[in-house]
């Protein structure tokens, strides 16, 4: 996949809150992010992210329809 394909297929989203760690060993972070463009602009969704992130970072999402399950599990 080239950089041009990635740019046209993805949607940017800004991290507004870090909810907590998730995954079997705490390797992923669950974050709330606001969609910045496209048909879902302004919508806030929950996603699981690998790697170091902090509030204000911008993610490139391939899909904006799915939300991550909540961490609580109860």
UniProtKB/Swiss-Prot annotation:
Q: Does the keyword Membrane apply?
A: no
Q: Does the keyword Ribonucleoprotein apply?
A: yes
What name does the UniProt record give this protein?
Answer: Small ribosomal subunit protein eS28
Under the GO molecular function aspect, what terms does this record hold? structural constituent of ribosome
Q: Name a single GO biological process.
A: ribosomal small subunit assembly
Q: Which family does it belong to?
A: Belongs to the eukaryotic ribosomal protein eS28 family.
Q: Which organism is it from?
A: Haloquadratum walsbyi (strain DSM 16790 / HBSQ001)
Q: Which UniProt keywords apply?
A: Ribonucleoprotein, Ribosomal protein
**For this UniProt entry, what's an example GO CC term?**
cytosolic small ribosomal subunit
What Pfam families does the annotation carry? Ribosomal_S28e
InterPro entries, alphabetized: NA-bd_OB-fold, Ribosomal_eS28
């Amino acid at each position: 996949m080239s950089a041009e394909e990635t740019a046209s297929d993805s949607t940017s989203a800004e991290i507004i809150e870090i909810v907590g760690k998730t995954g079997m060993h705490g390797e992923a972070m669950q974050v709330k992010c606001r969609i910045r463009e496209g048909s879902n602009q302004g919508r806030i969704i929950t996603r699981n992210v690998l790697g170091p992130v902090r509030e204000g970072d911008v993610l490139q999402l391939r899909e904006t329809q799915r939300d991550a399950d909540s961490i609580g599990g109860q």
